């Protein structure tokens, strides 16, 4: 049985830990509020941009753009969004497990796919397993701007355009609520979902539709990546807030259990002392 001193040390250590996890929970909650607003405020922009680009693409007649055309797949790209830090529950493990299983099912050789990864956790995961990581970015701020990911988004679109891979999938945690995040797979390139839109609005274009598509389609694809990153950041802060709340609750429960053990041990020690005193007094009579 642990001594009173040992139990007291564990109680004090657990109290300090609970203070840390509570502080981290509050910080994550504050970051979540802002990240959630950022993600939601970006949605109207994306919806309108998709509408405009879709109408231009549908109205282009016989003109086609490489980013809209499905071609034979020789190599697949995977853009995976993770975090730079842990302590976020299953936030990273869920998306990484999904990507890992998908790659194992779809591909027989590393030559058939390439990985673009955002976040230190994902980068470490794929490097340890010798997966072909061709691009990565780490150290993004908690509230990233488009400029923070402009370079890697531009390169990802460029790798599709130059034929390095023939399709690009994006994996990230979609924010549903503060207690629910869902791993999401989205086919980023080619942009086949645009031409599936049957609604059209008539526009007059200057310069030509083809020239406008050359500019807008890469920007649209880059914006999809940024939108997913904002969504993933909200999910990250929510997952970390929940994980820290659970850790704090567990710490409080452990403190209650240890305090009960401490009181019982203390009571047993006092009872033992009284018994010894009574026994000694009886021996003197």
UniProtKB/Swiss-Prot annotation:
One of its GO terms (cellular component) is proton-transporting ATP synthase complex. GO terms for biological process: proton motive force-driven plasma membrane ATP synthesis. GO terms for molecular function: ATP binding; proton-transporting ATP synthase activity, rotational mechanism. It holds the Pfam family ATP-synt. InterPro entries: ATP_synth_F1_ATPase_gsu (IPR035968), ATP_synth_F1_gsu (IPR000131), ATP_synth_F1_gsu_CS (IPR023632). It is a peripheral membrane protein. Keywords: ATP synthesis, Cell membrane, CF(1), Hydrogen ion transport, Ion transport, Membrane, Transport. It comes from the Bacteria. The keyword Transport applies. SUPFAM superfamilies: ATP synthase (F1-ATPase), gamma subunit. PROSITE patterns: ATPASE_GAMMA. Belongs to the ATPase gamma chain family. F-type ATPases have 2 components, CF(1) - the catalytic core - and CF(0) - the membrane proton channel. CF(1) has five subunits: alpha(3), beta(3), gamma(1), delta(1), epsilon(1). CF(0) has three main subunits: a, b and c. This is ATP synthase gamma chain. The lineage of its organism: Bacteria, Bacillati, Bacillota, Bacilli, Bacillales.
């Amino acid at each position: 049985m642990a001594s009173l001193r040992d139990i007291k040390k564990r109680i004090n250590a657990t109290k300090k830990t609970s203070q840390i996890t509570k502080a981290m929970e509050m910080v994550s909650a504050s970051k979540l509020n802002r990240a959630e607003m950022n993600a939601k405020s970006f949605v109207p922009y994306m919806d309108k941009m998709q509408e405009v680009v879709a109408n231009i693409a549908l109205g282009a007649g016989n003109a086609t753009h490489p980013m809209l055309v499905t071609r034979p797949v020789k190599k697949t790209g995977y853009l995976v969004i993770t975090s730079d830090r842990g302590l976020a529950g299953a936030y990273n493990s869920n998306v990484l497990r999904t990507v890992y299983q998908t790659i194992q099912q779809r591909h027989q050789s590393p030559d058939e796919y390439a990985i673009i990864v955002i976040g230190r956790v994902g980068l470490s995961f794929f490097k340890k397993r010798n997966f072909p990581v061709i691009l990565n970015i780490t150290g993004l701020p908690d509230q990233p701007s488009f400029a923070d990911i402009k370079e890697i988004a531009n390169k990802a679109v460029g790798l599709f355009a130059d034929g390095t891979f023939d399709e690009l999938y994006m994996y990230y945690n979609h924010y549903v609520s503060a207690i629910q995040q869902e791993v999401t797979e989205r086919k980023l390139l080619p942009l086949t979902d645009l031409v599936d839109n049957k609604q059209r609005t008539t526009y007059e274009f200057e310069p030509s539709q083809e020239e406008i598509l050359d500019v807008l389609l890469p920007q649209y694809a880059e914006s999809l990546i940024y939108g997913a990153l904002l969504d993933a950041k909200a999910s990250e802060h929510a997952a970390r807030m929940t994980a820290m709340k659970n850790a704090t609750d567990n710490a409080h429960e452990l403190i209650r259990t240890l305090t009960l053990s401490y009181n019982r041990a203390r009571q047993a020690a006092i009872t033992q002392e009284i018994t010894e005193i009574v026994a000694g007094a009886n021996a003197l009579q």
